């Protein structure tokens, strides 16, 4: 299986590269620079594509060219940026610069669509094509979050997923949107799960849990798929 992970240099993306795949599979990471401290066993092939999704068209072309020869089975789009004051009581839309709003829309929405458009012909050649979009609980109704550009971009991901399903259902394209709550991205996958789960005292999700969910999705047969999954922290009162 050839798996492409966009936004793979740190946090959840890095954990996905380290934690997914079986012997003989190829993991392809995408980020502006390859991280130096990846922990990957020798049984899986890891490649890297350096691309900056803040320049959507150029990045999409670069990534397409890098994976065209060997093909692609799964695209995991894990890239997203947010307002400088996001998740801070000081956040206010009126204080968010226009350039910041435009950058969020470009990176979180435009880049997603353009890259999928470029890679879709390759994906549809696979016997089991899959797209996994890492969204957010900020993209759910009554999320309780005020960040306008970030929230709108996560609602957009659900719309992208829904439209792709309708357009390519007969080609058996499986599209999943993961609505993730507050993640603990500072504790790496190499940390024992019981220790990682203590961080945040029930208010944060260890990356281990998300990796386990994605493993489950990738283990399904071609006869079914996970349409949408919401994964909040256990003490997140919004859900």
Which role does the model predict for each range below?
Residues 9, 17:
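N-terminal Rossmann NAD(P)H-binding glycine-rich loop of SDR-like oxidoreductase domains
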Residues 42-57:
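Rossmann-fold cofactor-recognition segment
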Residues 68, 106-127, 166:
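Amphipathic alpha-helical dimer-interface segment in Rossmann-like NAD(P)H-dependent oxidoreductases
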Residues 71-73, 87, 123-136, 170-174:
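Active-site loop of short-chain dehydrogenase/reductase
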Residues 81-102, 146:
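Conserved mid-core segment of classical short-chain dehydrogenase/reductases
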Residues 94-113, 157:
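Catalytic Tyr-X3-Lys loop
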Residues 95-98, 130-156, 161-162, 166-169:
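Catalytic loop of short-chain dehydrogenase/reductase
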Residues 177, 197-239:
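C-terminal helical subdomain
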């Amino acid at each position: 299986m050839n798996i492409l992970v966009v936004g793979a240099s740190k946090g959840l993306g890095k954990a996905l590269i380290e934690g997914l795949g079986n012997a003989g599979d190829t993991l392809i990471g995408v980020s502006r620079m390859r991280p130096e401290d990846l922990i990957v066993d020798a049984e899986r092939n890891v490649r890297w594509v350096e691309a900056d999704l803040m320049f959507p068209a150029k990045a999409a072309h670069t990534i397409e060219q890098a994976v065209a020869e060997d093909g692609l089975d799964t695209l995991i789009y894990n890239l997203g940026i947010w307002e400088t004051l996001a998740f801070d009581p000081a956040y206010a839309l009126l204080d968010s610069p226009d350039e910041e709003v435009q950058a969020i829309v470009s990176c979180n929405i435009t880049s997603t669509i353009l890259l999928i458009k470029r890679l879709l012909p390759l994906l549809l050649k696979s016997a089991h094509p899959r797209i996994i979009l890492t969204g957010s609980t900020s993209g759910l109704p009554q999320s309780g979050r005020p960040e306008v550009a970030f929230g709108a971009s996560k609602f957009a991901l659900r719309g992208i997923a829904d439209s792709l399903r309708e357009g390519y259902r007969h080609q058996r394209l499986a599209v999943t949107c993961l609505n993730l709550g507050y993640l603990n991205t500072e504790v790496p996958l190499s940390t024992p799960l019981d220790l990682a789960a203590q961080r945040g005292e029930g208010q944060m999700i260890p990356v281990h849990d998300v990796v386990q969910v994605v493993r489950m999705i990738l283990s399904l047969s071609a006869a079914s798929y996970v349409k949408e999954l919401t994964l909040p922290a256990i003490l997140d009162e919004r859900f």
